[in-house]
Amino acid sequence: EVLGQVQVDPAILSRTINPNIVAKAPGMKYRHYAPKGQMTIVEGKTEKVIGEINRLCREKMLEGHSVAVIATEETETRYQCDNVRSVGSRRTEGSIAAGLYDILREMDHIGAEYIFAESFEQDTLGKAIMNRMLKAAAYHVINV
């Protein structure tokens, strides 16, 4: 069976928390799954993302903060940070979607004050992953 046109709610597409948009469900608007630490998503080409996250990690660690990175299986060994966690493989976005909640909770368990995360392509499942991540990060995004 084929569905007709699918419309995405404006609360999901918004890149800011807009008080004028009424959320139909808690995960559509608010800092859903948000870790206690300040989370920032870094977007761009892989090499630049890795370089920027490593720079940010060094900066925050030198200031004495607890820092963590949310990476993928493909890149996790390339980060120079005390706490690097893989959320899954880019080859199977389902593994990322399935592991996202647990990895965000783990950030609280390790006491991460600053969390830097890779971004994901916003195609089918990637759009849902990024929606949750953007809300968890309160829309803190760096483009490199």
What is the predicted role of each segment?
Residues E1-P10:
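A conserved active-site cap/scaffold subdomain adjacent to cofactor or substrate pockets
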Residues L13-T16:
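Conserved catalytic/binding loops enriched for acidic/polar residues
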Residues I21-A138:
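A C-terminal functional module that forms or caps the active site or interfaces directly
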Residues V141-V144:
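Short, flexible loop segments at boundaries between secondary-structure elements
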